[in-house]
Structures are given as C-alpha cells and as structure tokens.
Regions:
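Active-site catalytic microenvironments in core metabolic enzymes, especially phosphate/sugar-handling
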Residues: 1-261
Length: 261
C-alpha cells in the first residue's frame, strides 16, 4: 500500500487545510507514492519510537506532533530532531503528523478526551472560520453533577494522570465541562462564556490560573496526558477503513515531562 492511500483516510477525517498557520502537519519524511507495509502510531517521533519502529518492521510512523516545526539548517545529529529525521531517512521510515487539523476536526482530539471522561451532548467551544463543524475545544455535560475534586480524581484514574494543577474551586459541583487538549489557555474566556463549571486543558501559565476569577475551575492535566488519546483516535480512524494494512500502537511513546510526587 502506498503512503497516500493511508494519509488520504486520515485527511478525509481531518483535512490538512484545517491546521493552524504555524503548524506543519502532513507528510514530513517520505514520498506520497512510497510503498509501506506497517504503521506505528505515537504522540511524538523520538529515538525510542524509531527503535520500536525498526524492531517491529514499521516503515511509517504517524504521530500527533510534527517532529519538524521550523526549517532545519543542518543535519549533523546535534539535536534530537536532526538525529530522528536523519535516522528516519537512512532507515527509509516515513514520518507523517496530524496535529491541529486533528485537534479541530469534528470528533477529533477534544471530542475523544471528553468522551473518555463521560461528558456528553458535545458541541464545539470555538468554531473555526472554515465551518464544516470544525473548531477547537468542546463543551458538554456530565449525566449528573459531581463534586469538583472527585471529578478531578476520576480524571486522574481514567487518564493515568499523576498531577493536576488547578485554580481555585469555583463551585462545589461540576455538571458542565469544557475540554481542550494541548495548550488551551486561549480558550478560558470561551469556556467561561459557555457556562462551564470546569475547564480541562494543559500548558497553563501562572497568571492563567487567576483568569477564571472563580467563575469556573481550570484544571491543567498536562500536555502529553491530554493528547495521549491521539494514538487510539488515529488507530480507530485507520482501522475502520483499512482491513489489510497493519497498524501498531506504540508502547514506547512516553511523556518527556517527569514528576516528583
């Protein structure tokens, strides 16, 4: 099977034109007409993931995060990005990323995370100008109200989150939940206007925890933790449309952030 046959399936779900202007989603290493036999799914391209790809005979690695965001000026293995790109080229492993286009796709990243947390009746938090139901973040409701701290403990258990950083508790109970995977501080205002009791996201800065002004609780669950669901989401997209192509979920896709708890 050629790469384009596989990426076309992903891009029907999450068209590349839905990515943000700063992004670099799409085929990064390889040619669309290259023949591939097995794909490995991960959050990031790392040397450990490439070790796994080589060991498992995977000649296509599909990740959520693009390994290259800016132009590379040299290939001398001076940093991890250069080493991984050079190694992928030498090993004939194609690299493909579906990033903010997957974030904004209907049924995409935030939708998947919200569903994992039992949030229903989902709608887009910040619709994109492209229309077609695309946009960033979602808001919805739990079947019934639950204590705020207990809900955060549920998040910890279901997502295997070690640490949650959160703002002042706004209300004792949570019913309406807003979710944005990855860095979502820019949508705090949208979550507040949507009447959310809690906003689940990542990469919050110090002052971001003051921004809600006790109108809602903001919970930072960690960037990797919020986006690990990308692996299963991409697996589901491909599995529904590819019956004869082997797709493997990485066992070595790991969080680069470590916690001392």
């Amino acid at each position: 099977m050629i790469i384009k046959q596989i990426t076309d399936i992903i891009e029907r779900f999450a068209p590349l034109e839905w990515q943000e202007s700063y992004d670099n989603a799409g085929l990064i290493v390889g040619r669309p007409d290259d023949e591939v036999h097995k794909a490995l799914l991960a959050v990031d391209v790392t040397e450990e993931v490439l070790d796994e790809a080589e060991a498992e005979g995977c000649d296509l690695v599909i990740t959520h995060h693009p390994i290259v965001f800016r132009a590379l000026k040299r290939f001398n293995s001076a940093d991890p990005v250069e080493r991984c790109v050079e190694r992928a080229i030498r090993s004939r492993i194609a690299l493909y990323a579906c990033h903010t286009n997957l974030d904004s796709a209907p049924g995409g990243m935030s939708w998947r995370l919200a569903e994992m947390l039992g949030v229903g009746n989902l709608r887009v938090l910040q619709p994109s100008e492209t229309g077609d139901g695309a946009g960033f973040g979602v808001v919805g409701e739990l079947p019934e109200a639950i204590d705020t701290v207990e809900f955060m403990r549920i998040i910890q258990r279901r997502l295997e989150v070690s640490v949650i950083r959160y703002s002042d508790i706004a209300t004792s109970g949570v019913r309406r939940v807003a979710v944005c995977t990855g860095a979502g501080s820019s949508l705090i205002g949208e979550a507040r206007r949507a009447g959310a009791d809690i906003y689940i996201t990542a990469d919050m800065k110090y002052n971001d925890f003051m921004a809600p002004d006790k109108a809602l609780t903001v919970a930072d669950i960690g960037h990797f933790e919020s986006e690990y669901c990308a692996i299963q989401l991409i697996f589901d997209i491909l599995s529904k449309n590819l019956c004869t192509f082997a797709v493997r979920k990485s066992e070595r896709s790991r969080n680069p952030v470590n916690y001392l708890v």
